Amino acid sequence: MQSRFTFLATRTLKSTTTKAKNRTFSSSTVESSTKQPPQFSQTLAGLRARLAVESPTLSDFIHLQSNNTYSVEVGTKKKPLPKPKWMREAIPGGEKYVQIKKKLRELKLHTVCEEAKCPNLGECWSGGETGTATATIMILGDTCTRGCRFCNVKTSRTPPPPDPNEPTNVAEAIASWGLDYVVITSVDRDDLADQGSGHFAETVHKLKTLKPNMLIEALVPDFRGDRGCVEKVAKSGLDVFAHNIETVEELQSSVRDHRANFKQSLDVLMMAKEYAPPGTLTKTSIMLGCGEAPEQVVKTMEKVRAAGVDVMTFGQYMRPSKRHMPVSEYITPDAFEKYKTLGMEMGFRYVASGPMVRSSYKAGEFYIKSMIESDRSVSSQLPIS
């Protein structure tokens, strides 16, 4: 696995060094247009050295902290402070929202939008600025075998067995909506021999058979790091393989279930890159406001990028209920924007970063859709060797 990591890191850095070497985001540095840019080695250390010269640095985030513009306090348990204005959610509504909710009830489908109390539910289901409604479908039931401290999905050691007809029913239901891009996710199913990977792969395959041109993002669990499970899903016909690391490396044990960890999640994303057909994107997401420090976020971004991940999203952690892990702070839009700038300079193909952004946020889906279509258009014009 170490050799695979080295290969991905080298390939990633080679593909991004050229396009970024002439750009700078340091407000205190003005480089002459005639000065030759420094050369950096094609390693993780080289990536860090280049970013120190060309991108927002930790001092930028520390400056935000010292000016009280990095985050806003949440108050105490007895005296909580009101949410900042940028965290106020819109009330769900609209004709499309009502139609989708009714359709989901008729088909007995579960969505992570509802189960996880996503703050963007109203925007995504009503169509938002794009006018196209989207929903993230959750398969393998509505009960998870794990108990992460941030998640609102109900848990059980022995959830009901999966519905064998679900792959067909879900595929037919989604195909009937006429969507261009859909996200399919699932709960963890540690109780199943294959962690639910076969059920997941079957759902994707059947949907792709019905709608060959539909772009499918699969937001999958870690399958306990099982290579065979990852391979099965990666080869199922999906367009985007997504798996969330959820938080920085240092907070994994206090935020996620004890069966999940940072290395295992990175391994899953690297395996997906290995097994999926060329052109398949990999994607991950982390929450901010869990108690992480800026330097931990930057270090996590470096490792994720060196693992070959194409897309990364950042959003504000929101406590689903008083039973869940408390929010440590509300990160400001300015700080989120700096993480986005840094991520693009690192070489991620797309970064969605904002207080209300979630891993399957609709604005990101449309951008990824256009990116995939552009890649395929270019690929189709290349001569066959």
Swiss-Prot record:
Keyword line: 4Fe-4S, Iron, Iron-sulfur, Metal-binding, Mitochondrion, S-adenosyl-L-methionine, Transferase
Pathway recorded for this protein: Protein modification; protein lipoylation via endogenous pathway; protein N(6)-(lipoyl)lysine from octanoyl-[acyl-carrier-protein]: step 2/2
Superkingdom to which the source organism belongs: Eukaryota
PROSITE patterns: RADICAL_SAM
Family annotation (InterPro entries): Aldolase_TIM, Elp3/MiaA/NifB-like_rSAM, LIAS_N, Lipoyl_synth, Lipoyl_synth_mt, rSAM
Chain ranges of the Radical SAM core domain: 129-349
Cofactors (names): [4Fe-4S] cluster
BP GO annotations: lipoate biosynthetic process
Additional notes on this entry: This protein may be expected to contain an N-terminal transit peptide but none has been predicted.
Name used for this protein in its record: Lipoyl synthase, mitochondrial
Record organism: Populus trichocarpa (Western balsam poplar)
Name of the gene this protein is made from: LIP1
